[in-house]
């Protein structure tokens, strides 16, 4: 069975509609409901696509002015991202039930203090020092904050005398992480299990509203008894500790002002809030930083796993691949893992309408596809099987971290039952749930990167890319190595996006003998996200170039047919019939196209000359076997062959050169491949027009007449534009448009 692209518009299957479609709920033809297992049917509720679309819409609502409500149970990952990255408004649920729940918990603690009860963290020391006792809970709170303010931070904003080995600011966390942590800690405290006052939660909201954010050390948490040290800097800001630094004011050149928390609070008319009783411990004993960084990571990860499917669809088009690899029978019927089914369905639908991908598979005879690749290679053909498990792991992690932000009880110790007054000593601060979510997310990101790297390196390799030039060069390859550097860079990216594990060490007098390292794991996942984004941006850049080259090929081949027809008539028309001319043209066209596919490493003139020379064997075979009349003189025939070859070579070379020039310099418009692409078209057009990454090759075409960097920016600068569009969320709106 071979492949035929002659009926691209026909439906592959005419099956009943499936349980869900491109938006996660609407059926799409081809995926048969009766074929799905029970596990697969749950995908309608938990697909990566539906979660991505829901999160995107929610985030847009917050960006457009909707306030995030802190009520202890409805905080979403999108809400964390909105507060952390877009300074969205935050309001507390001030309903009587919620406020009473907090009040009862605080009263329970006050009663224990007044009666002299022994309660961990109020009358005892901490961790391995819990055998000490004191009746001074206020001073104990100061001692707690003091011993946790141990992080390394820049001591000055002035330039260093000696150039640092790394960014001097890389010892502190990004503000987004800290804002997210404040929000999540508020959401935990408002549940009323921590014995704190309502006014403390209000003060934390006030910090967010004023955008006064503590400078928090990047390192120092093992996320065992919560993220103790990072959270202590939030507590230090609340009380106005003059030694705690905070960000404040408008951003200048991307950097905000830094000042003493005491001075900045006064500048913003915010009263310091002295902490009482259990409140220092209530702030510190929690997983807020781990959950914040994890939530921000997953908000990006779920986008990237969908973008990977879009890249795979575009790669299928660029490599003239087949949609049949994603047929419903293979996935929804034969092996219905939910992630695999979702991935196959998405790619199947994205390829709809493509004039490059082969949309149908037909039976052909053995001799018709002899010596041709029978099927797509693994990076395309098995992409649903490879990406599917990653989708499932990211969905699972998404749900776990959402739960961590909400539905678990407070994550400090002890927990206070306001209804009974009981205190419960446990370990909800142990953030292993977040760690596991991040480990599986990071492993998933690595696998996504590995798949896309394999697709990318196949696309730039002339031995594998089905007739594209080496390194997707738009001009003569002897002086154009366009994507060769990218092939190396993407290898580096996928190597750096390693899922390397975290290593637990016993800590704090062996009291914390096991610890989750959740924040460390989440930080590593953020790094993996950044590296994977670099890889995806590079691949998208290569894909757009490859699609333009395919469009050029689609224009060149009809032009070549005209040249063959006209030169056959000129050289052999006097002694060949119309039928013979037609047959000969078919033979020559087949031979020339086969030659062009195998000679993409040659420069244009040499390539067309050797292509024309292959006509000798075709012509000899034709005149020997067809019984065609030939000129009485063999010299006349040889002269006709020579004239034909020379004219074909010259005209073909000129045609290719003209098309190259028109494509490179925009005479065909900024998006010449649009007419050939399926539903991935908006991504290609966004890159080419909205962010202005045009086809590469102008400097090479003009033989570097003006030097480097005059006619075009560097390859890396163009990829940086794509990278930034992914990181700042602009690409998300394009991906939504593909599926919504």
Swiss-Prot record:
Its EC number is 4.3.1.24. It holds the Pfam family Lyase_aromatic. The modification 2,3-didehydroalanine (Ser) is found at residue 225. There is a cross-link at residues 224-226 (5-imidazolinone (Ser-Gly)). It catalyses: L-phenylalanine = (E)-cinnamate + NH4(+). Disulfide bonds: none annotated. GO terms for biological process: cinnamic acid biosynthetic process; L-phenylalanine catabolic process. Pathway: Phenylpropanoid metabolism; trans-cinnamate biosynthesis; trans-cinnamate from L-phenylalanine: step 1/1. It comes from Amanita muscaria. Homotetramer. This is Phenylalanine ammonia-lyase. One of its GO terms (molecular function) is phenylalanine ammonia-lyase activity. GO terms for cellular component: cytoplasm.
């Amino acid at each position: 069975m071979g492949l035929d692209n002659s009926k691209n518009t026909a439906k592959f299957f005419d099956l009943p509609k499936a349980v869900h479609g491109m938006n996660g709920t609407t059926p799409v033809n081809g995926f048969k409901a009766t074929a799905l297992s029970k596990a697969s049917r749950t995908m309608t509720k938990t697909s990566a696509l539906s979660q991505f679309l829901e999160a995107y819409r929610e985030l847009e609502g917050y960006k457009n002015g909707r306030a995030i409500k802190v009520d202890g149970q409805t905080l979403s990952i999108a809400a964390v991202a909105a507060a952390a990255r877009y300074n969205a408004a935050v309001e507390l649920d001030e309903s009587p039930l919620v406020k009473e729940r907090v009040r009862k918990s605080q009263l329970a603690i006050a009663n224990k203090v007044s009666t002299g009860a022994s309660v961990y963290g109020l009358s005892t020391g901490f961790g391995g020092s819990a055998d000490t006792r004191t009746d001074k809970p206020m001073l104990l709170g100061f001692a707690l904050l003091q011993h946790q303010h141990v992080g390394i931070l820049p001591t000055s904003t002035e330039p260093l005398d000696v150039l640092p080995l790394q960014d001097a600011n890389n010892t502190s966390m990004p503000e987004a992480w800290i804002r997210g942590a404040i929000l999540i800690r508020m959401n935990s405290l408002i549940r009323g299990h921590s014995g704190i006052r309502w006014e403390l939660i209000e003060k934390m909201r006030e910090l967010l509203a004023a955008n006064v954010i503590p400078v928090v050390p990047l390192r120092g948490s093992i996320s065992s008894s919560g993220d103790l040290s990072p959270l202590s800097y939030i507590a230090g800001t609340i009380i106005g500790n003059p030694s705690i630094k905070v960000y404040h004011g408008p951003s200048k050149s991307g950097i905000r002002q830094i000042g003493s928390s005491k001075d900045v609070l006064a500048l913003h008319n915010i009263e310091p809030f002295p902490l009482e009783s259990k409140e220092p411990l209530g702030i510190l004993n929690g997983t807020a930083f781990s959950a914040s960084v994890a939530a921000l990571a997953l908000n990006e990860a779920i986008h990237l796993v969908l973008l990977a499917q879009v890249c795979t669809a575009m790669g299928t088009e660029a490599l003239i691949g087949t949609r049949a690899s994603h047929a419903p029978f293979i996935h929804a019927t034969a092996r219905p893992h939910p992630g695999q089914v979702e991935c196959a369905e998405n790619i199947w639908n994205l390829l709809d309408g493509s004039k490059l991908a082969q949309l149908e598979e037909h039976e052909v005879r053995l001799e018709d596809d002899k010596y041709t690749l029978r099927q797509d290679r693994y990076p395309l053909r098995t992409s649903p099987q490879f990406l599917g498990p990653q989708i499932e792991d990211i969905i699972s992690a998404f749900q776990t971290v959402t739960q961590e932000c909400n539905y678990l009880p407070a994550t400090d110790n002890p927990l206070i039952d306001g209804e009974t007054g009981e205190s419960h000593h446990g370990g909800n601060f142990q953030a292993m749930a977040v760690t596991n979510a991040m480990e599986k997310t990071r492993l998933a990101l690595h696998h996504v990167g590995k798949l896309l790297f394999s697709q990318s390196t196949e696309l730039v390799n002339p031995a594998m890319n089905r007739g594209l030039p080496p390194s997707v060069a738009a001009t003569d390859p002897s002086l154009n190595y366009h994507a060769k550097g990218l092939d190396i860079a993407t290898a580096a990216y996928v190597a750096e996006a390693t899922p390397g594990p975290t290593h637990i060490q016993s800590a704090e007098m062996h009291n914390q003998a096991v610890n989750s390292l959740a924040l460390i794991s989440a930080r590593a996942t953020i790094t993996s996200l950044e590296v994977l984004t670099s890889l995806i941006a590079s691949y998208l850049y290569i894909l757009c170039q490859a699609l333009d080259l395919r469009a050029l090929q689609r224009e060149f081949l009809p032009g070549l047919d005209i040249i063959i027809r006209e030169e056959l008539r000129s050289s052999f028309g006097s002694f060949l019939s119309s039928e013979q001319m037609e047959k000969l043209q078919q033979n020559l066209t087949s031979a020339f196209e086969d030659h062009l596919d195998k000679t993409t490493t040659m420069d244009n003139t040499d390539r067309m000359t050797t292509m024309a020379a292959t006509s000798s064997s075709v012509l000899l075979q034709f005149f020997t076997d067809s019984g065609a009349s030939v000129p009485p003189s063999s010299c006349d025939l040889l002269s006709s062959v020579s004239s034909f070859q020379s004219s074909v070579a010259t005209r073909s070379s000129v045609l290719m050169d003209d098309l190259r020039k028109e494509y490179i310099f925009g005479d065909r418009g900024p998006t010449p491949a649009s007419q050939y692409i399926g539903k991935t078209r908006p991504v290609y057009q966004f890159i080419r027009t909205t962010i202005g990454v045009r086809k590469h090759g102008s400097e090479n075409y003009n033989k570097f007449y003006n030097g480097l960097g005059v006619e075009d920016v560097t390859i890396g600068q163009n990829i940086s534009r794509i990278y930034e569009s992914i990181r700042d969320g602009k690409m998300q709106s394009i991906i939504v448009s593909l599926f919504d």
